[in-house]
C-alpha cells in the first residue's frame, strides 16, 4: 500500500496558492497600466500653469529663450498690446549679438518692420546679460521698478509657465508696493501638453523642463550662488 509523503503540500493548496499569485500579478499589471495611462494623459500638465488674464495690466514681459520661443512669445505679447490689455511690451534682451551689433537697435527695427511703428514705439527693452530664468527675473524686476510698472503679464512658452511662474513670484516677493504677476503661455512648436509623448521634440522638452522643475523644487538656486544681473531699460 502506497503512503503519501507528508512533506508534500496538498494539491488543492497548491492550486489555491497559484491562483492567489495570479490575482496579485494581475492587480499589479492593472495598477501599472492605469498609472501609465494617467501619466501619459496628464504628465504634460506638470509643466503648464497659466493664469486668468486681467482686463488691463501695465506691461507684457517677453522672456528670452530660443529663436522659435522668442518669436512665439513676441507674437503673444504684441497681441495683448493690440487688444488693449497692456500698454507696453518689455522684451528681455542681451546688450549685443555675437557680431557686436546692438540688440535693442536690431530688435526695434524688427518690431517696426513686422508690427508697424505704432507697436514699436510701445516696446521697451530690458538689457542684461543673463543665463537663467532666475537671473532674468532679477534683472527684469529692476527694469520694471524703474518704470513703476506693477501689473505684469509674463509671456513665455507653454512648457515654461509653471517653473517661470514660481521663480518670478519668488524673485518679486516682498516688493513695496507689491507686484501682481500673471503667467501667459504660448505654443512655440516645442511642446504640447496633450499627446506630449508622441513626438520626439515634445519628449525632449518634457524631460529637460521636468528635470529643471524638480531640481529647483528641491534645491532652489542649487549649491552655487548666482551673481545678480543688472538690468537697464532701453527704448
Residue spans for each PLM region:
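Short, intrinsically disordered terminal tails adjacent to the first/last structured region
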Residues: 1-11, 235
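N-terminal type II signal-anchor transmembrane helix
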Residues: 7-51
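Coil-to-alpha-helix initiation sites in intrinsically disordered, low-complexity, charged segments
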Residues: 13, 17-20, 194-201, 205, ...
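A structural signal for short, hydrophobic/glycine-enriched beta-strand patches
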Residues: 42-198
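Short linear elements at protein peripheries
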Residues: 57, 223-235
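A transmembrane-helix-recognition feature enriched in membrane-embedded lipid enzymes
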Residues: 199-228
Amino acid at each position: 500500500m502506497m503512503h503519501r509523503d507528508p512533506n508534500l503540500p496538498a494539491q488543492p493548496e497548491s492550486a489555491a496558492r497559484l491562483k492567489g499569485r495570479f490575482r496579485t500579478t494581475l492587480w499589479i499589471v492593472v495598477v501599472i497600466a492605469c498609472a501609465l495611462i494617467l501619466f501619459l494623459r496628464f504628465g504634460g500638465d506638470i509643466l503648464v500653469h497659466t493664469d486668468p488674464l486681467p482686463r488691463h495690466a501695465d506691461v507684457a514681459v517677453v522672456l528670452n529663450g530660443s529663436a522659435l520661443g522668442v518669436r512665439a512669445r513676441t507674437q503673444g505679447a504684441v497681441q495683448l498690446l493690440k487688444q488693449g490689455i497692456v500698454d507696453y511690451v518689455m522684451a528681455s534682451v542681451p546688450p549685443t549679438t555675437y557680431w557686436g551689433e546692438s540688440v535693442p537697435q536690431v530688435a526695434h527695427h524688427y518690431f517696426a518692420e513686422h508690427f508697424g511703428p505704432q507697436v514699436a514705439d510701445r516696446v521697451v527693452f530690458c538689457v542684461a546679460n543673463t543665463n537663467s530664468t532666475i537671473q532674468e527675473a532679477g534683472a527684469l524686476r529692476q527694469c520694471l521698478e524703474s518704470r513703476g510698472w506693477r501689473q505684469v503679464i509674463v509671456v513665455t512658452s507653454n512648457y515654461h509657465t509653471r517653473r517661470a511662474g514660481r521663480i518670478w513670484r519668488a524673485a518679486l516677493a516682498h516688493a513695496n508696493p507689491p507686484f501682481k504677476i500673471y503667467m501667459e503661455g504660448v505654443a512655440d512648436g516645442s511642446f504640447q501638453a496633450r499627446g506630449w509623448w508622441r513626438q520626439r521634440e515634445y519628449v525632449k522638452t518634457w524631460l529637460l523642463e521636468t528635470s529643471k522643475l524638480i531640481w529647483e523644487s528641491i534645491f532652489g538656486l542649487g549649491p552655487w550662488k548666482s551673481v545678480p544681473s543688472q538690468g537697464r531699460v532701453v527704448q
